[in-house]
């Protein structure tokens, strides 16, 4: 019956099993409805219980014999039997317990049938230990369901006998009421039970003999072991126990399962990227921040379409939108070298094309993925306007970076007024008219020098040609920066070495002498340039030591008098070490500085300012305080930390990376205030005081460094 599910439906096959089920269930129901109530009163209440248990047992075995797999062998494939070119033989002989048993070839199932296996003509399947095909259960009886068929026969025989016997007993108790309904129904059930008892009892007896002898109905009918020895028998008791107590035989056919539809994607396909925001974790010189930007699906089409066996694509164009300072400086040099900007930039690594812009603020504005793929001439020519405004808006700013403006922190490019030597103590700063005018002159020199010098053009050349070599440091006459310095009208270049922290700011000192007094008009916004500290050689370190000796031996330089009109211009001058005591932030910086272990009793040696004994107070300056120790550190580090408007994140971002060895050599030479020498903001001396000493005399060689920085090597 299980094998017929996939074939054409035949109603005639279900007539015998349906009749058997109706007679079984119908007769038993009538018996329980009309006969059992009287028997429970007159005979015993156990009569209905016994008949109920027997009926359930019959029904269970009937169901198992009908719906259970008898042990069907699966059919072989069409080419499985093609062992040789010729046709397979019809029989094969095997030996079982010393007896030759013949196996027949099944043309339908295309394999040799195992011993005791036969092909059912009704089910059209080969069944293991085939017994017969029973129409009353509409299923073949084989090895797997023979036990339930045998128990069905036994239980059915007992149930029929019970129904017939208890029915007869009920009639005997109501012999005077034979015309009654209960007695009439009971006699009808007895007739049906008696009618089925003869064949069922006969069939049960026959199978009892077969089980005792260890044979099947097929073997018994066909007479395979007639007159011979049965190799499959193990004795009467073993045969009975094998049928009733052995473990169930394995199933050879898999249960039919519903096919599931599974969508399989090739491994080279990536999941679709939605136009959502992608959070990127970045590291910016110790600053951890999150960047939220929109990334479109089209931005990943190029990388997804490339395969390993395809030819490599041409190098991508550099994304100069990340280097705002480089774009500005290249734009300033377009008048001298326009060929560098007219053509596309040279190839850069592929990672820069698909690399997002980094920011230290999570609230930065998102830029499109493909913005500013080329460096346009129009964008670069717009930058001098902001530089021109920087001469009218004085401010102090830390060393610039190459971050684009759109990806910069909102507080990164702001101007913060502070006193470089007082570590953020605004009450101890000095406002000097002479110092104010002198500082404005240095700030104005950015515009004049930035448009004529070729230092930024050398930065572009270094970007294209690689890092600066050692020979270029020793032969500064070959660099374009040296020619631009010689072409200038400066007769007396300053003496000494300019730190790479002062990128292209030597012009501020020269222009300050020619433009000492300028009125500020507003805040400044200067474009940054990169800072590199990893290219100092031994010759440069030696020049630092030689320059320090020259500073100690150089005579004082006269300083201009104060301008009373500029006393309250708003720019704070740099006080001497004896004007105001340092705040606690300087002591914090001394812990980080390698030279912070200077004894407190040792005064600081001024580099670009007047000595401690020669410095006077400016207009409105406070009383001199105790002399602060020289911490050997640039004041831009300590002054930034104490500013209330500058956060800790900005302080870390503004500090450039410096190796301990180079930091010691640079900071023993001179101190600087936020990227400016101390001489730019020093207070003017009072009347009667000797002039300041300034190391601006002697021969000097100017060499362009890595990232557009300028090196000054004393001769």
Swiss-Prot record:
Chain positions with Phosphotyrosine modification: 91
Protein's name according to its UniProt entry: Palmitoyltransferase ZDHHC5
Residues annotated with Phosphothreonine modification: 294, 303, 348, 350, 411, 436, 659
Compositional bias (Low complexity): 359-373, 422-432
GO terms of biological process kind: positive regulation of NLRP3 inflammasome complex assembly; positive regulation of pattern recognition receptor signaling pathway; positive regulation of protein localization to phagocytic vesicle; positive regulation of protein localization to plasma membrane; positive regulation of pyroptotic inflammatory response; protein localization to plasma membrane
Domain free text: The DHHC domain is required for palmitoyltransferase activity.
Bias kind Polar residues: ranges: 442-478, 666-677
Every DHHC domain range: 104-154
Pfam family membership, one: DHHC
Record-annotated active site: 134
Protein's membrane topology: Multi-pass membrane protein
Enzyme class: transferase
Location of Omega-N-methylarginine modifications: 617, 697
């Amino acid at each position: 019956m299980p094998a017929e599910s996939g074939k054409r439906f035949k109603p005639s096959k279900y007539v015998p099993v349906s009749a058997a089920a109706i007679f079984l269930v119908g007769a038993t129901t009538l018996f329980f409805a009309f006969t059992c109530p009287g028997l429970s009163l007159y005979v015993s209440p156990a009569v209905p219980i016994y008949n109920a248990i027997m009926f359930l047992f019959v029904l269970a075995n009937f169901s198992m014999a009908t719906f259970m797999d008898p042990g069907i062998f699966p059919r072989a494939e069409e080419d499985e039997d093609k062992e040789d070119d010729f046709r397979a033989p019809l029989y094969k002989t095997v030996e079982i317990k010393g007896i030759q048993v013949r196996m027949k070839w099944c043309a339908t199932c295309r394999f040799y049938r195992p011993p005791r296996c036969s092909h059912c003509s009704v089910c059209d399947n080969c069944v293991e230990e085939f017994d017969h095909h029973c129409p009353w259960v509409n299923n073949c009886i084989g090895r797997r369901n023979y036990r339930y068929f045998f128990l069905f026969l036994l239980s059915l025989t007992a149930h029929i006998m019970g129904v017939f016997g208890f029915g007869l007993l009920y009639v005997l108790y109501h012999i005077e009421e034979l015309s009654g309904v209960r007695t009439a129904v009971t006699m009808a059930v007895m007739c049906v039970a008696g009618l089925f008892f003869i064949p069922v009892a006969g069939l049960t007896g026959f199978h009892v003999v077969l089980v005792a002898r260890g044979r099947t109905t097929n073997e018994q009918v066909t007479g395979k072991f007639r007159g011979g020895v049965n190799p499959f028998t193990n004795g009467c008791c073993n045969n009975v126990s094998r049928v009733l107590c052995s473990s169930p035989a394995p199933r050879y056919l898999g249960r039919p399962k519903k096919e599931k539809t599974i969508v399989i994607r090739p491994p080279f396909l990536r999941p679709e990227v939605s136009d959502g925001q992608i959070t990127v974790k970045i590291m910016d010189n110790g600053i951890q921040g999150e960047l939220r930007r929109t990334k479109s699906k089209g931005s990943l089409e190029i990388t997804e379409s490339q395969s390993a066996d395809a030819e490599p694509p041409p190098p991508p164009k550099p994304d100069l939108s990340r280097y705002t300072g480089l774009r500005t400086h290249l734009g300033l040099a377009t008048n001298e070298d326009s060929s560098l900007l007219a053509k596309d930039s040279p190839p850069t690594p592929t990672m820069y094309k698909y690399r997002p812009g980094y920011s230290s603020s999570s609230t930065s504005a998102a830029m499109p993925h493909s913005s500013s793929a080329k460096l346009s001439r129009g964008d670069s020519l717009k930058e001098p306007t902001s530089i021109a405004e920087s001469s009218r808006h004085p401010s102090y700013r830390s060393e610039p970076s190459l971050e684009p403006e759109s990806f910069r922190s909102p507080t990164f490019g702001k101007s913060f007024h502070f006193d470089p030597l007082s570590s953020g103590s605004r009450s101890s700063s000095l406002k000097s008219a002479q110092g104010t005018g002198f500082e404005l002159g240095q700030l104005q020199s950015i515009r004049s020098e930035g448009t004529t010098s070729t230092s930024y053009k050398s930065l572009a050349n270094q970007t294209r040609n690689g890092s600066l070599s050692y020979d270029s440091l020793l032969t500064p006459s070959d660099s374009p920066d040296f020619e631009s310095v010689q072409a200038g009208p400066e007769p007396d270049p300053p003496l000494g070495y300019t730190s790479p922290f002062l990128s292209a700011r030597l012009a501020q000192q020269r222009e300050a002498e020619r433009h000492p007094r300028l009125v500020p008009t507003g805040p400044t916004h200067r474009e940054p340039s990169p800072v590199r500290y990893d290219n100092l050689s031994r010759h440069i370190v030696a020049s630092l030591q030689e320059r320090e000796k020259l500073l100690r031996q150089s005579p004082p330089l006269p300083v201009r008098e104060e301008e009373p009109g500029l006393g309250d211009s708003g720019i704070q001058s740099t006080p001497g070490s004896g004007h105001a005591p340092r705040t606690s932030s300087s002591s914090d910086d001394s812990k980080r500085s390698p030279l912070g272990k200077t004894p407190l009793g040792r005064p600081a040696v001024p580099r670009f300012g007047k000595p401690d004994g020669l410095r006077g107070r400016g207009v409105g300056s406070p009383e001199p305080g105790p002399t602060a120790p020289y911490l050997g550190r640039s004041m831009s580090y300590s002054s930034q930390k104490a500013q209330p408007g500058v956060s800790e994140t900005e302080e870390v971002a503004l500090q450039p990376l410096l190796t301990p060895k180079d930091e010691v050599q640079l900071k023993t030479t001179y101190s600087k205030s936020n990227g400016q020498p101390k001489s730019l903001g020093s207070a003017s001396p009072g009347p009667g005081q000797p002039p300041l000493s300034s190391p601006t005399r002697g021969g000097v060689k100017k060499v362009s460094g890595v990232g557009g920085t300028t090196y000054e090597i004393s001769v």
